[in-house]
Amino acid sequence: MRIGHGFDVHKFGGEGPLVIGGVRIPYTQGLLAHSDGDVVLHAVTDALLGAAALGDIGKLFPDTDPAFKGADSRGLLREAWRRINEKGYQLGNLDVTIIAQAPKMAPHIPQMRVNLAEDLLCHMDDVNVKATTTEQLGFTGRGEGIACEAVALLVKKGTGEIVAW
């Protein structure tokens, strides 16, 4: 078993859509980023890459490469997951925490879980997404941006490490 941790943060700004966990969320602003700024998918990608010892999202998809300008983060996650699968890993489980004062994430979490399970070719029971605030403290509490943390457990395929419930 291998554990990876991912973290991402983006500042609000611009007129682009707000995309979190692959879901377009109605809001007054998007997030400033080279790609679509999806903090959930970026943190998840980093957690998975870290667990597989494949570096990080910036190494795989550098923001200096124009090919990734405005990139759909679901596509980036799928490509990272393909490489992780090639190393013989499958997902044990994934736990995601979104840190945002606004907008409220609860109505969108079920679809985020669906998107992650689809992209990672796993069951929804293997994916947890939750959200919290910082009680109006810090940059997220002031509504300046959104942060996300993710923890992923990978297991080698065929090792019997996965428990079937």
UniProtKB/Swiss-Prot annotation:
Residues marked Transition state stabilizer (site): H34, T133
GO biological process: isopentenyl diphosphate biosynthetic process, methylerythritol 4-phosphate pathway; terpenoid biosynthetic process
Protein residues bound to a divalent metal cation: D8, H10, H42
Task of the protein: Involved in the biosynthesis of isopentenyl diphosphate (IPP) and dimethylallyl diphosphate (DMAPP), two major building blocks of isoprenoid compounds. Catalyzes the conversion of 4-diphosphocytidyl-2-C-methyl-D-erythritol 2-phosphate (CDP-ME2P) to 2-C-methyl-D-erythritol 2,4-cyclodiphosphate (ME-CPP) with a corresponding release of cytidine 5-monophosphate (CMP).
Protein's name in the database: 2-C-methyl-D-erythritol 2,4-cyclodiphosphate synthase
InterPro entries: MECDP_synthase (IPR003526), MECDP_synthase_CS (IPR020555), MECDP_synthase_sf (IPR036571)
Pathway(s) served: Isoprenoid biosynthesis; isopentenyl diphosphate biosynthesis via DXP pathway; isopentenyl diphosphate from 1-deoxy-D-xylulose 5-phosphate: step 4/6
One Pfam match: YgbB
Coiled-coil blocks: none
Enzyme class: lyase
Similarity field: Belongs to the IspF family.
Quaternary structure (record): Homotrimer.
Annotated catalysed reactions: 4-CDP-2-C-methyl-D-erythritol 2-phosphate = 2-C-methyl-D-erythritol 2,4-cyclic diphosphate + CMP
UniProt cofactor(s): a divalent metal cation
Note on cofactor: Binds 1 divalent metal cation per subunit.
Any GO molecular function: metal ion binding
Keywords assigned by UniProt, alphabetized: Isoprene biosynthesis, Lyase, Metal-binding
